[in-house]
């Protein structure tokens, strides 16, 4: 075993593994190089990835470094700005780029040429004057249209940016940050462990089998769900997450923050927070706490739920004037109104009005919000995706209402809006709500499954379960019941053996399918084992439990058990309080880890959204118990 010298800015995941495999390894700070007897070591690791910037070796140390290279001893450099005669004039930001194992001259055990690795929000030294004939081990590529493997020789990939490569016979160069691969949650974990094991073996000059650190996110893969009450632990963890992750603003008095974005720093694993306050997230989060109060009598949960409901209607709704009833999108987007976001914000209010004795203090406010949305709803019952107040002139408003102007047939934009019209009608709202909702869902279902799609075909199906359940509940029409079963049965085609639902998009027609530089689907190719807990699977616990309440068909109870079981098994368990109890957007159901195509501008696989994901899942996990208690 080689004796290894480590120069770095303190401990890291990689330095800890080096110390583990080599008990004589020693760690020094870069600035302490003068006290080191370099000749006393057999191998050297220069780790700059945990520093603020790419490391530039001081000239005296650089001279020593180049002399060491001449000895033939193994040297590994990580995020060092200049090596040999190569220097990096540009440090590239890597956000939507992933790495491909090229498999040319240097074999990494456990990897196959074309395997894909995600180094998250990274930095990469782009060295000038590298030979075009360089056969890099790992190369960075932008927007790879594949889940976890691709053809490395595909012409469209191009040469890529070298990320791991050999300089001469004895210097292994990592252009990127990778020393904190574990705390930065590089994925897939198995692929990265192969790479790290290769680096360790290179320095040790013999094969090694390190004990890798515990993953920051673990899962209870073998948890069993036999009854609705078996979700209690997951619900407790999920509700507690809002507190420990500091998402509630003044206990909900001023809303809830949007969540955690996908951007995880490769330097130290810090995950970026999204601090916008969204009305929909606030309403959905309030719904999760409301259901806890209804189930357990927890007065603290009731207080938070009331705070969030008050916030939505007291601060985020126009109370008078030309736009009376309008519910704002966010604390920043004061004049933008999305009907789908409004629908989800008022969902807890309408459930409370329908299924509790005391009802909701804000039922009329919710009705006003829906009345405002009707003003730009066409004769077919559908709306344009959003309303921008500065552009909504009386002329444009009339055009929407009279001619189906710019409407969309996406369930993503319209189905929950129609469901809320139905719930409001059921609780005493105007008959017009029923008429518009029936027309809207009929328009969509007459086109289904060829209606427009947002992220995937799977999402459109998941989005329809709750609205079609409410539609059948209100009308009792056999045709509407058949629609519900049709969509539910279609969903079975994309259900994974674990109970989750794979993303699927026949013909890749969705607006966000294979997109770049915007909102993007997690799906690369149909058949990828990826579940989307932001746009698809997250809607199903509430949808299936409502369908069971309406039909009393054990089929829907079983579908709820399957998806709820999947969700308690893929909930994050972590020593990090900002992660423990959360669900992330993307989940690979074969690898059983958070992973997927990271092309979305901010809401890629590792993101955690307070409303769409956390609030909706927690409501859905609890609602079945309320159904059993005959709400």
Task: Explain the meaning of each model-derived region.
Residues 146-236:
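Extracellular ligand-binding/catalytic regions of CAZymes and related secreted enzymes
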Residues 217-228, 283-299, 344-361, 415-431, ...:
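Well-ordered alpha-helical scaffold segments within catalytic/enzyme domains
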Residues 265-282, 327-345, 352, 396-414, ...:
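Solvent-exposed loop and edge beta-strand segments that line ligand/cofactor-binding
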Residues 501-508, 557-631:
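CBM-like carbohydrate-recognition segments
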Residues 76-149:
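An acidic, glycine-rich "communication" segment
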Residues 3-85:
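Helical hinge/lid and interdomain linker segments adjacent to catalytic or ligand-binding clefts
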Residues 202-280, 299-329, 364-395, 495-499, ...:
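Low-complexity, Ser/Thr/Pro/Gly-enriched N-terminal "stalk/linker" regions
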Residues 67, 191-198, 215-217, 223-245, ...:
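Extended, well-ordered alpha-helical scaffold segments
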């Amino acid at each position: 075993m080689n004796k290894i010298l480590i120069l770095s800015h303190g401990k890291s995941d990689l330095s800890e593994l080096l110390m583990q495999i080599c008990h004589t390894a020693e760690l020094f700070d870069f600035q302490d190089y003068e006290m080191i007897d370099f000749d006393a070591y057999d191998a050297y690791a220069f780790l700059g990835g945990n520093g603020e910037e790419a490391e530039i070796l001081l000239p005296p140390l650089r001279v020593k470094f180049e002399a060491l290279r001449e000895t033939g001893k193994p040297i590994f450099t990580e995020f060092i700005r200049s090596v040999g005669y190569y220097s990096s004039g540009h440090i590239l930001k890597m956000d939507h780029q992933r790495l491909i194992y090229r498999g040319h001259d240097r074999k990494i055990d456990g990897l196959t040429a074309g395997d894909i690795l995600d180094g998250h929000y990274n930095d990469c030294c782009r060295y000038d004057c590298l030979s075009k004939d360089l056969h890099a081990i790992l190369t960075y590529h932008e927007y790879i249209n594949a889940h976890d493997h691709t053809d490395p020789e595909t012409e469209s990939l191009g040469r890529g940016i070298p990320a791991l490569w050999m300089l001469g016979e004895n210097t292994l160069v990592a252009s990127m940050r990778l020393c904190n691969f574990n705390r930065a949650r590089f994925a897939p974990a198995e692929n990265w462990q192969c790479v790290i094991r290769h680096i360790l073996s290179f320095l040790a000059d013999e094969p090694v089998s390190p004990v890798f650190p515990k993953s920051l996110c673990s899962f209870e893969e073998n948890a069993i769900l036999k009854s609705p009450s078996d979700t209690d632990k997951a619900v407790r963890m999920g509700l507690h997450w809002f507190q420990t992750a500091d998402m509630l603003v003044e206990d909900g008095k001023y809303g809830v923050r949007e969540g955690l974005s996908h951007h995880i720093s490769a330097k130290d694993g810090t995950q970026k927070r999204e601090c916008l306050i969204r009305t929909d997230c606030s309403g959905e989060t309030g719904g999760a706490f409301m259901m806890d109060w209804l189930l357990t009598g927890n007065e603290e949960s009731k207080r938070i739920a009331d705070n969030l409901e008050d916030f939505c209607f007291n601060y985020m709704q126009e109370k008078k004037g030309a736009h009376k009833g309008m519910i704002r999108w966010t604390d920043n987007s004061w004049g933008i109104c999305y009907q789908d976001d409004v629908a989800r914000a008022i969902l807890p209010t309408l459930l409370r009005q329908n299924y509790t004795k005391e009802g909701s203090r804000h039922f009329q406010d919710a009705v006003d919000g829906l009345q405002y949305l009707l003003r730009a709803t066409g004769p077919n019952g559908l709306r344009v995706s959003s309303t921008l107040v500065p552009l909504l002139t009386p002329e444009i408003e009339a055009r929407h209402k009279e001619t189906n102007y710019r409407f969309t047939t996406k369930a993503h934009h319209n189905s929950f809006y129609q469901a809320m019209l139905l719930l409001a009608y059921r609780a005493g709202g105007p008959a017009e709500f029923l008429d518009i909702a029936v027309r809207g869902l009929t328009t969509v279902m007459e086109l289904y499954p060829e209606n427009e799609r947002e992220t995937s075909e799977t999402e459109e199906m998941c989005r329809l379960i709750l609205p079609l359940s409410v539609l059948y509940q209100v009308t009792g029409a056999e045709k509407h019941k058949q629609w519900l079963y049709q969509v539910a049965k279609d969903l079975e085609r994309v259900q994974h053996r674990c109970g989750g639902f794979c993303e699927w998009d026949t013909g890749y027609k969705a607006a966000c399918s294979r997109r770049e530089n915007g909102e993007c689907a997690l799906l690369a190719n149909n058949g990828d084992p990826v579940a989307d807990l932001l746009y698809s699977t997250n809607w199903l616990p509430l949808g299936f439990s409502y369908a069971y309440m309406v039909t009393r068909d054990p089929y829907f109870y079983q579908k709820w058990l399957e998806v709820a079981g999947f969700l308690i098994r893929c909930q994050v368990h972590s020593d990090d309080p900002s992660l423990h109890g959360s669900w992330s957007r993307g989940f690979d159901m074969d690898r059983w880890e958070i992973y997927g195509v990271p092309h979305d501008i901010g809401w890629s696989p590792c993101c955690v959204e307070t409303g769409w994901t956390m609030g909706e899942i927690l409501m859905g996990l609890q609602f079945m118990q309320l159904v059993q208690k005959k709400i």
